[in-house]
Amino acid sequence: MYQDKILVRQLGLQPYEPISLAMHEFTDTRDESTLDEIWLVEHYPVFTQGQAGKAEHILMPGDIPVIQSDRGGQVTYHGPGQQVMYVLLNLKRRKLGVRELVTLLEQTVVNTLAELGIEAHPRADAPGVYVGEKKICSLGLRIRRGCSFHGLALNVNMDLSPFLRINPCGYAGMEMAKISQWKPEATTNNIAPRLLENILALLNNPDFEYITA
């Protein structure tokens, strides 16, 4: 089925705001014939404050900008070496509920890390993916007219120190992890294809077309 096809865009390293704007425009203007898309991107350093975000969780932003986002959740950090995957899916067409999509994204990351020999798990009380007690992947979504946008952010080989300037996802003292702590050779270039392969498998292996911007 043609509409089952997914366009995959590799966007490289980009500022947060133009990508967020493009994601909103895509979602606002799509119709029933619009193909779903997955965007793979890294962002320049930025704190994003989710819809539920409270100012007290931003401790010392310093020179890193703080941008309001309409995704679910609290404050998080994006920076180079973190693989962000935005999922622009027509949930009605794919017969997915919101909770099912959250579970699917978490399982995508768990499966990707398992391939690398890293045992990870989701938590019922705090969305995302964890290795032991440390958070390695953040997750935040928005649904509009039955279509999802925003997505997940997987820490690959980034500098984790900016997370100390916030209470990540609203949890004071939440420790963060990255793949390179276990696999020093990990980069977004070699993790992104695994992440994509795993999410497509969980979406029942639709046809896809890879587009590099």
UniProtKB/Swiss-Prot annotation:
Reaction catalyzed: octanoyl-[ACP] + L-lysyl-[protein] = N(6)-octanoyl-L-lysyl-[protein] + holo-[ACP] + H(+)
Gene: lipB
Lineage per the UniProt record: Bacteria, Pseudomonadati, Pseudomonadota, Gammaproteobacteria, Enterobacterales
Pfam families: LplA-B_cat
InterPro entries: aa-tRNA-synth_II/BPL/LPL (IPR045864), BPL_LPL_catalytic (IPR004143), Octanoyltransferase (IPR000544), Octanoyltransferase_CS (IPR020605)
The protein's name in its UniProt record: Octanoyltransferase
Pathway named in the protein's UniProt entry: Protein modification; protein lipoylation via endogenous pathway; protein N(6)-(lipoyl)lysine from octanoyl-[acyl-carrier-protein]: step 1/2
Protein source organism: Escherichia coli (strain SMS-3-5 / SECEC)
Biological process per Gene Ontology, one example term: protein modification process
4Fe-4S is among the record's keywords: no
Disulfide bond annotation, renumbered to this chain: none
Site residues (Lowers pKa of active site Cys), renumbered to this chain: K135
Domain BPL/LPL catalytic, chain residue ranges per copy: 32-207
Enzyme nomenclature, EC number: 2.3.1.181
Keywords, alphabetical: Acyltransferase, Cytoplasm, Transferase
Biological role stated in the UniProt entry: Catalyzes the transfer of endogenously produced octanoic acid from octanoyl-acyl-carrier-protein onto the lipoyl domains of lipoate-dependent enzymes. Lipoyl-ACP can also act as a substrate although octanoyl-ACP is likely to be the physiological substrate.
Keyword Transferase: yes
One MF annotation (Gene Ontology) recorded for this entry: lipoyl(octanoyl) transferase activity
Miscellaneous field: In the reaction, the free carboxyl group of octanoic acid is attached via an amide linkage to the epsilon-amino group of a specific lysine residue of lipoyl domains of lipoate-dependent enzymes.
Top-rank taxon, per record: Bacteria
Entry-linked SUPFAM superfamilies: Class II aaRS and biotin synthetases (SSF55681)
Binding-site list for substrate: R71, G72, G73, Q74, V75, T76, Y77, H78, S138, L139, G140, G151, L152, A153
